[in-house]
Amino acid sequence: MSGPLANSFTYSKPMTTMNSIDTFSLSALPRRFILASATALALLGSQAFAADKLPVTASFSILGDLVRVVGGERVVVTTLVGANEDAHVFEAKPADAKTLLTSKLVVINGLGFEPWAGKLIKASGYKGETLVATKGVKPRHMEGEQGHGAHAGHAHEEADPHAWQNPNNVALYVRNIAAGLAKVDAAGAVTYQANAEAYVKELQALDAWTKAQIATIPADKRKVITSHDAFGYFAAQYGVKFLAPQGVNTEAEPSAKQVAQLIKQIQREKIRAVFVENMSNPKLIAQLSKDAGATLGASLYADALSNADQPGATYLQMMRHNVTQLVAGMKLN
């Protein structure tokens, strides 16, 4: 440039380097705006990640745990009957029907454990796959039980639904779950099978450990009182005698005559090991223990897992807790 303006014009390089822009932008924005933006991005990311997973509904907490084990990172599991809740007396809500409609697979125990499941599935309009986890399990039958469709005045042979109390049955459960998941998510079939077989090894170890623990108790001392008859499969597998004021479900209260007979049996057989279950009303068993002169032990987990901060948050934890408490109680007999 020439002329009179040449001396008055000065060129300055704009201060707009990348570093200066970044520094200015971040320092100028309010801290709470930055944090809110980061939180929103993280939430969007987690929602997108969850959307990629297979939605599965399990009828109750023990099944929910098994589905999570087999499904791993490929599934997101919703449980209808949660921790410390009683599936025998569960009443479905409209929200439960909505849950089914978003599921690709519904997993139930079967053997009459969830008498409400069929009605809920039909009422919800769910058209997807339903898996009965007890497929292939040899059911234990009991004569004279009332409930789950029995009617007063008639003999009724009822299948005991608590098949998970024998780890060998749970091996069938997880293999059935693996097959059910693979049916609706063929791409994950290898993963599901591998997870199931790895868990079967843990179940075999649990079975061996339980046998070793029970073996420390003399055979004539292996007697226990529990709230309801939920341990029949455990009893058959490990040679422990269980007595209960209630049958295989918790709906029907025992009569005064039945309670009196049980008290006499407890006293006659000198049973000191008495346990209440986490989802049962403890008043009956506590009074029974007092009247019979027995010792009330820690809670057992029969039909439901515990919350995460309690000792029965998973199936394996539940079983090990139960065995430990049972052995301690039977030592008092």
Language model features with spans:
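N-terminal signal peptide c-region/cleavage motif recognized by signal peptidases
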Residues: 45-47
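Sec-dependent N-terminal signal peptides
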Residues: 36-40
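N-terminal secretory signal peptides that target proteins for export/translocation
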Residues: 1-28
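N-terminal export leaders
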Residues: 30-35
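Extracytoplasmic metal-acquisition and chelation regions
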Residues: 50-333
